[in-house]
């Protein structure tokens, strides 16, 4: 049985009354229900409210997603209490839409899977509280999901990928390099020592005031940087990738942010404009910081591949590198990683962009994987808790650093 620490976030016991009676009012169209196992996945770890039903063969029977992006763009970042309230306002509708699209009721489900770690505490609490009430009302098994494990395994829904494989998870909240040896068997090779790449790109976008740019006003920060960088010259400014002399697989993005912030301040003074106005060189700055980010990610990933092959953790041939998370949708960064994959005889695989960002499908699929393997399927949820902070797998990053693998220089012809 999966036991979680009692020091993690406490969830009040669901009320005995069947508060989700609305679920019994679904108009279920007559049809032949699949004999396959069905898992409802619920995702509320950050600022997206997602739900989906997936069967054991990987068919997505229904899904729904509510994004809070436009709300948080106006506030300059995610405000946890606001995210919590928006989850509360939308989770019932999202789950109802998902089940209606499948033409099933909760009684038809084999289990309910929900993200409980890691993430924003207030957001995680909404999803877990809602899920536990469904679990108790309909007497279904509960499958607690690790958000980053779900991202890592999403590729097995869309592609035939066998264990082991290497995964780079890059988003606004995480930057992790891990070897995936099984459904719940991960070796952590490296992680960000400070902030995540998506967070850094968002902060640079805010510093450049890209929300005021006509091409970028409705985009997230990272997407705005990618869009603007297409018109920029990355050679116009020199921004070097961080940690170039550290022979490990860890990452750092705070330095990139500070260097870029100083550059922006300098250019504002040079152009005689106030903070908050658009620089004429904004596209060049975006291109330079994006290139430095891509090179940093590529070099650490290159070292991870070499380490895994040296230690016989990956096959010398036919090795697979999976890149997932919101930043994985950046095509420039993906191209840099493709160069590394080609140089190391690896196959680079990325989930479709809509599955790279947070969604209910990946949670439901992770539930299916766990249900099939008999891992972490709970029938007693009395002690279940959410965990805002939670590591991924077994950390062997020190062993990677001790190997001190020198990475050959690659020409990043991007």
Swiss-Prot record:
Tell me the GO BP annotations in alphabetical order: tRNA threonylcarbamoyladenosine modification
Q: Name one GO molecular function term.
A: metal ion binding
Question: What does the UniProt cofactor note say?
Answer: Binds 1 divalent metal cation per subunit.
Where found, per UniProt? Mitochondrion
Cited Pfam families: TsaD
> What is this enzyme's catalytic activity, as reactions?
L-threonylcarbamoyladenylate + adenosine(37) in tRNA = N(6)-L-threonylcarbamoyladenosine(37) in tRNA + AMP + H(+)
Q: Could you say which cofactors this protein requires?
A: a divalent metal cation
Principal cellular location given in the protein's record: mitochondrion
Q: Where is the transit peptide?
A: 1-29
Give a yes or no for keyword Acyltransferase in this entry.
yes
Q: A single GO CC term, please?
A: mitochondrion
| Residues recorded as bearing N6-acetyllysine in the entry | 74, 140, 203, 230, 299
Sorted UniProt keywords: Acetylation, Acyltransferase, Metal-binding, Mitochondrion, Transferase, Transit peptide, tRNA processing
EC number(s) recorded for this UniProt protein: 2.3.1.234
Superkingdom to which the source organism belongs? Eukaryota
Q: Where do the TM regions start and end?
A: none
Family stated for the protein in its record: Belongs to the KAE1 / TsaD family.
Subunit-level organization: Monomer.
Described purpose of this protein according to its UniProt entry: Required for the formation of a threonylcarbamoyl group on adenosine at position 37 (t(6)A37) in mitochondrial tRNAs that read codons beginning with adenine. Probably involved in the transfer of the threonylcarbamoyl moiety of threonylcarbamoyl-AMP (TC-AMP) to the N6 group of A37. Involved in mitochondrial genome maintenance.
Full protein name: tRNA N6-adenosine threonylcarbamoyltransferase, mitochondrial
């Amino acid at each position: 049985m999966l036991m979680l620490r009692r020091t993690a976030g406490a969830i009040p016991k669901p009320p005995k009354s069947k508060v989700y009676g609305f679920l019994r009012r679904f108009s279920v169209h007559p049809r032949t229900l699949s004999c396959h196992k069905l898992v409802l996945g619920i995702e509320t770890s950050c600022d997206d409210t997602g739900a989906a039903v997936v069967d054991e063969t990987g068919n997505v029977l229904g899904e729904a997603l509510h994004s809070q992006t436009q709300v948080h763009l106006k506030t300059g970042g995610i405000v946890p209490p606001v995210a919590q309230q928006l989850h509360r306002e939308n989770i019932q509708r999202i789950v109802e839409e998902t089940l209606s699209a499948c033409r099933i009721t909760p009684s038809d489900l084999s289990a309910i899977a929900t993200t409980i770690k890691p993430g924003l505490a207030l957001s995680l609490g909404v999803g877990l509280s809602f899920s536990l009430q469904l679990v108790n009302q309909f007497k279904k098994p509960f499958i607690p999901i690790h958000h980053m494990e779900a991202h890592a395994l999403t590729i097995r829904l869309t592609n035939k990928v066998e264990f082991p494989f290497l995964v780079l998870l890059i988003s606004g909240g995480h930057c992790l390099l891990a070897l995936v040896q099984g459904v719940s068997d991960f070796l952590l090779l490296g992680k960000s020592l400070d902030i995540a790449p998506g967070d850094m790109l968002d902060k640079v976008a805010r510093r450049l005031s890209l929300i005021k740019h006509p091409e970028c006003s409705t985009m997230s920060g990272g997407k705005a940087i990618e869009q603007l960088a297409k018109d920029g010259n990355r050679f116009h400014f020199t921004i070097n990738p961080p940690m170039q002399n550290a022979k490990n697989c860890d990452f750092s993005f705070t330095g990139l942010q500070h260097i870029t912030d100083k550059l922006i301040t300098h250019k504002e003074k040079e152009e005689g404009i106030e903070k908050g106005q658009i620089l004429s060189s904004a596209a060049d700055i975006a291109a330079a910081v994006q290139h430095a980010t891509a090179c940093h990610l590529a070099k650490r990933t290159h070292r991870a591949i070499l380490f895994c092959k040296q230690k016989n953790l990956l096959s010398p041939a036919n090795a697979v590198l999976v890149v997932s998370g919101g930043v994985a949708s950046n095509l420039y960064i993906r191209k840099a990683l493709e160069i590394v994959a080609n140089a190391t005889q690896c196959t680079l695989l990325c989930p479709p962009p809509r599955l790279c960002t947070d969604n209910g499908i990946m949670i439901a699929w992770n539930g299916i994987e766990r249900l099939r393997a008999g891992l972490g399927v709970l029938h007693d949820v009395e002690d279940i808790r959410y965990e805002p902070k939670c590591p991924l797998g077994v950390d062997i990053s020190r062993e990677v650093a001790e190997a001190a693998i020198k990475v050959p220089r690659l020409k990043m012809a991007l």
